[in-house]
Amino acid sequence: MKVTFEELKGAFYRVLRSRNIAEDTADKCAEMFARTTESGVYSHGVNRFPRFIQQLDNGDIIPDAKPQRVTSLGAIEQWDAQRAIGNLTAKKMMDRAIELASDHGIGLVALRNANHWMRGGSYGWQAAEKGYIGICWTNSIAVMPPWGAKECRIGTNPLIVAIPSTPITMVDMSMSMFSYGMLEVNRLAGRELPVDGGFDDNGQLTKEPGVIEKNRRILPMGYWKGSGLSIVLDMIATLLSNGSSVAEVTQENSDEYGVSQIFIAIEVDKLIDGATRDAKLQRIMDFITTAERADDNVAIRLPGHEFTKLLDDNRRHGITIDDSVWAKIQAL
């Protein structure tokens, strides 16, 4: 089925207000969930909303909490999220990193005691739209086996890097081949994964999303490389925020909350003039996209460039929502 942006935002807002969330908070949170979905990231927008409400109902998320600054060291700040709403807090932290970068050239905010930020790419994009390089990542509960294991001991720990090119170039990737949200998207669509995404119960690589969702043997991207990157991202976020590691979140909490996150903004224009910046970025993009294609029918892709088209299509034709997901939201 298809819905308009306003219909989708209204559905989110209704559910949030039914939980006695303050009007302004409910409006901003509903807006962010709807924008994420409109951008084509269904896995962390509309599909994730029922899970968000479950955590809200369970008390994992404290909707009226106010993030507090703990430490300030010039370009680096440490904050405590107080388990406030994840996407609203993350937006505020990237805004703060941008403010610090305006003063110092670079700004870094380390956040502890946070909740799931939904679409991490929103915050990298937020920085790039203002002309900054945006880098952010989060740890998580243990949902992926480290390389060589079959028991979950590391997080998917998504990493975002956004560049202020035209259009914006952005990598938004979990340390697994696919996020659990994308496994769900493919399962609901009745599709196999395009490449192996995990192991089946016999330890064989599989493209079946439902199997991986059930046994939790998701595959690290790049095998041992994704496993290693997940571990060091967790270590950095834990140390800089003085927050919880994947181990602590997994062993001490009843669900995924109280995670640690990093937000970095770099003001490129303090280092290079705008015309030179744009020319250098365009040369990089042209060099890549003019390579001989392996398949004449498949374009060479630059990361994040597809979001401009997805957003335009959804605004023109309506946002496609899975019927079963929409039914869940209507029932909340």
UniProtKB/Swiss-Prot annotation:
**Name of the protein:** 2,3-diketo-L-gulonate reductase
> Can you say where in the cell this protein is located?
Cytoplasm
Specify one Pfam family: Ldh_2
**Active site feature:** 44 (proton donor)
Q: PANTHER family given for it? A: 2,3-DIKETO-L-GULONATE REDUCTASE, OXIDOREDUCTASE-RELATED
What cellular-component terms does GO give this entry? cytoplasm
Lineage of the species this protein comes from: Bacteria, Pseudomonadati, Pseudomonadota, Gammaproteobacteria, Enterobacterales
Q: Which family does it belong to?
A: Belongs to the LDH2/MDH2 oxidoreductase family. DlgD subfamily.
* Keyword Oxidoreductase attributed: yes
What job does this protein perform? Catalyzes the reduction of 2,3-diketo-L-gulonate in the presence of NADH, to form 3-keto-L-gulonate.
For this protein, the record's InterPro entries field holds: Diketo_gul_Rdtase (IPR023689), Mal/L-sulf/L-lact_DH-like_ah (IPR043144), Mal/L-sulf/L-lact_DH-like_NADP (IPR043143), Mal/L-sulfo/L-lacto_DH-like_sf (IPR036111), Malate/L-lactate_DH-like (IPR003767)
Principal cellular location given in the protein's record: cytoplasm
Enzyme Commission number, as recorded: 1.1.1.130
Q: Which gene encodes it?
A: dlgD
List the catalysed reactions: 3-dehydro-L-gulonate + NAD(+) = 2,3-dioxo-L-gulonate + NADH + H(+); 3-dehydro-L-gulonate + NADP(+) = 2,3-dioxo-L-gulonate + NADPH + H(+)
Name a GO molecular-function annotation. 3-dehydro-L-gulonate 2-dehydrogenase activity
Main EC class the enzyme belongs to: oxidoreductase
Quaternary structure (record): Homodimer.
| Keywords noted in UniProt | Cytoplasm, NAD, Oxidoreductase
Binding of NAD(+): at which residues? 168-174, 224-225, 304-306
